[in-house]
């Protein structure tokens, strides 16, 4: 069997499809399209719609070179192929062509290129265009054009898509369909159904920073957190200053997302200190104002903590705004903004400290400043014994050694006693909650006797006499 016949046997269904197109393409005279059918099969083109302009021109030249046809016959046959192609394009892609015509984009030459590309991709409606289709178009353009031309084509491509989106959201079903909801897919910010936001992104040269890939292999929890943060930022922050929003939030969040995926981090609220330090090294290579960009860590944790349906007691940082505390527990002149547990690197100890803090914040009546002070001292104790399985396994001798070291430091007796009191309260909590059977130290053994300290605030006679003489001036 010849190679051509073998190929035809393998492509039988595709060849039959092509034949049906010619038979039903509006040209009844078989002799006008018979050669065209053979030509396309030889080119391994099995759909007349997919024949490029170059193919059509070469078909005409093939007819001329064969010497079998007059110029009139060549013109008739080459025209027949074009007419059949046009018939099937309008039959199968008429709605797409209409949508492109209605898109209010004036550059017909660029629209024609886009139209041919979409037809080759089997796109029947503009709403089928997504970032993946755009990426394929961009890759195709880069093979033929310089950067400036590629950007011109893509600008028209994006305008066509954006016009389609705006038309769709004029109806209720369209608005529902375009409602932002998390899906494992790529989100391209210029394709959002918010015209004001879309305008902000038009002049961003590096469009990659506008691509948010939620299809990539990563923790679903992380991806949902980033999606929530992205939408919160777009909807609520710097709507009137897109440059500031980009620099302070969008770019740093993009870097943070990439970092977490690479590091296999699955929870932004569980970021550890050493992970944050590694991320900072990456940021240092990207911007001069590192401090500005690093605020994305605290901003992200805060947004997630404040917007969660339920309080995230497991979070490494708690934000007091979430708790709606009574005024008598707050100091309005110097309010405590957050309680941090990230400094406790032993995770079991951190969980115990969070339980203790949860009790004080939720049930106890101490002021938040007082709670923070207690937690600060307990954190020092926990970090000292971070190598142990947990603070519950630390015995009396180990604690005695720790307390003796505290005594050796230049610490006032009153300060030392306060620390012992903070520690005993923490241990009492662990004991009551059943984390340990008995408290491994007796506070009275360590508490020191203290005396009220008198602060001499007397002033010299010369000074107070001068004050008395000048009182009349006040």
Residue spans for each PLM region:
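Charge-rich, intrinsically disordered N-terminal extensions
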Residues: 1-436
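Long, amphipathic, Lys/Arg-enriched alpha-helical "connector/arm" segment
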Residues: 9-20, 350, 450-474
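Short hydrophobic/aromatic segments of transmembrane alpha-helices and their interfaces
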Residues: 354, 382-383, 447, 460-464
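A generic structural signal for ordered alpha-helices
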Residues: 377-380, 445, 449
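Long, charged, glycine-rich C-terminal linkers/tails
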Residues: 395-399, 439-448
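Short, highly charged low-complexity linear segments
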Residues: 413, 436-445, 460-466
């Amino acid at each position: 069997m010849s190679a051509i016949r073998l190929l035809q046997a393998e492509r039988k269904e595709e060849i039959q499809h092509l034949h049906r197109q010619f038979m039903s393409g509006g040209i009844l005279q078989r002799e006008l399209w018979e050669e065209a059918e053979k030509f396309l099969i030889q080119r391994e083109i099995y759909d007349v719609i997919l024949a490029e302009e170059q193919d059509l021109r070469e078909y005409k030249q093939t007819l001329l070179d064969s010497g079998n046809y007059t110029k009139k016959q060549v013109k008739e046959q080459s025209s027949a192929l074009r007419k059949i192609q046009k018939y099937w394009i309008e039959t199968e892609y008429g709605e797409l062509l209409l949508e492109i015509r209605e898109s209010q984009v004036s550059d017909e030459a660029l629209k024609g290129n886009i139209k041919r590309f979409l037809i080759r991709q089997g796109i029947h409606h503009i709403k089928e265009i997504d970032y993946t289709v755009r990426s394929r178009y961009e890759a195709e353009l880069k093979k033929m054009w310089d950067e400036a031309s590629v950007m011109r084509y893509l600008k028209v491509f994006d305008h066509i898509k954006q016009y389609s989106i705006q038309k769709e959201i004029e109806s209720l079903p369209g608005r529902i369909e375009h409602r932002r909801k998390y899906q494992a897919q790529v989100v391209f910010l210029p394709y959002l159904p918010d015209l004001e936001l879309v305008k902000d992104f038009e002049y961003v040269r590096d469009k990659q920073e506008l691509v948010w890939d939620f299809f990539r292999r990563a923790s679903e929890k992380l991806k949902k957190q980033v999606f929530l943060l992205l939408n919160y930022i777009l909807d609520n922050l710097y709507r009137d200053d897109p440059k500031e929003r980009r620099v302070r939030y969008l770019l740093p969040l993009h870097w943070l997302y990439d970092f977490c995926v690479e590091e296999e981090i699955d929870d932004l609220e569980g970021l550890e200190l050493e992970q944050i330090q590694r991320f900072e090294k990456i940021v240092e290579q990207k911007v001069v104002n590192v401090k500005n960009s690093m605020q994305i860590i605290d901003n992200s944790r805060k947004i997630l903590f404040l917007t969660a349906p339920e309080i995230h007691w497991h979070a490494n940082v708690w934000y007091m705004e979430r708790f709606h505390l009574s005024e008598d527990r707050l100091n309005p002149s110097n309010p405590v903004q957050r309680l941090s547990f990230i400094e406790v690197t032993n995770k079991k100890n951190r969980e115990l400290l969070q339980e203790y803090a949860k009790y004080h914040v939720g049930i106890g009546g101490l002021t938040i400043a007082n709670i923070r002070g207690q937690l600060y001292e307990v954190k020092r104790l926990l970090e000292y014994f971070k190598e142990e399985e947990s603070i519950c396994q630390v015995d009396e001798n180990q604690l005695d050694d720790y307390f003796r070291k505290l005594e050796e430091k230049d610490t006032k007796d009153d300060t030392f006693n306060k620390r012992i009191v903070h520690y005993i309260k923490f241990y009492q909590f662990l004991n009551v909650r059943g984390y340990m059977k008995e408290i491994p130290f007796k506070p009275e053994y360590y508490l020191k006797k203290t005396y009220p300290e008198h602060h001499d605030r007397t002033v010299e006679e010369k000074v107070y006499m001068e004050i008395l003489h000048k009182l009349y001036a006040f």
